[in-house]
């Protein structure tokens, strides 16, 4: 906290007036970045999609414009969350929000009869969350150089194909 206070030109005490600890600071930081980068507009597009397939497509689309704006912060949290409880709390907060979004889409998919009954809702939500994760976007768009529009189509098709297909149960 001392280094951060020095970097922004305030006293450590002034920083603690606003944030009682690093965890609260990290949570405020990720919330601020999401607000500044208009994450709610992307979430609204997902929520208001005509059907579950449209919601998956809207979520993938949101990744193509939101992730470049948060890439530095997402990578920093990813590098530090295992060892830093404050970064871990900020990451857990974001992941919980993502999982709520995935669960909502899976509920729609199931209500529309497009989720194969061999999937549990929890398994399906985890898969959808992973397919639309920052890591998958980063690997496909940045490392593999897949154009963003193609990424949207690949993620949408992969999610719909996987979740509409039966899963064998291992006994």
Predicted segments, located by residue:
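Hydrophobic/aromatic-rich alpha-helical bundle segments in the mid-to-C-terminal region
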Residues: 110-158, 166-171
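Helix-turn-helix
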Residues: 1-24, 28
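Short, basic, alpha-helical segments at the C-terminal edge of helix-turn-helix-like DNA-binding modules
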Residues: 1, 30-37
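Amphipathic alpha-helical interaction segments
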Residues: 3, 24, 58, 76, ...
């Amino acid at each position: 906290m001392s280094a951060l206070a020095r970097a922004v030109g305030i006293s450590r005490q002034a920083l603690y007036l606003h944030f009682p600890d690093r965890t609260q600071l990290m949570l405020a930081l990720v919330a601020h970045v999401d607000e500044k980068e208009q994450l709610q507009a992307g979430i609204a597009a997902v929520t208001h999609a005509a059907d579950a397939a449209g919601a998956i497509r809207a979520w993938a689309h949101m990744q193509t414009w939101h992730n470049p704006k948060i890439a530095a912060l997402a990578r920093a949290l990813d590098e530090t969350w295992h060892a830093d409880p404050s970064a871990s709390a900020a990451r857990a907060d974001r992941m919980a929000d993502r999982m709520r979004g995935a669960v909502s889409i899976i509920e729609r998919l199931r209500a529309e009869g497009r989720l194969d009954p061999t999937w549990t809702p929890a398994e399906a939500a985890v898969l959808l969350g992973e397919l639309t994760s920052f890591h998958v976007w980063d690997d496909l768009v940045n490392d593999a150089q897949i154009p963003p529009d193609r990424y949207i189509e690949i993620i949408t098709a992969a999610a719909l194909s996987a979740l509409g297909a039966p899963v064998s149960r291992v006994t």
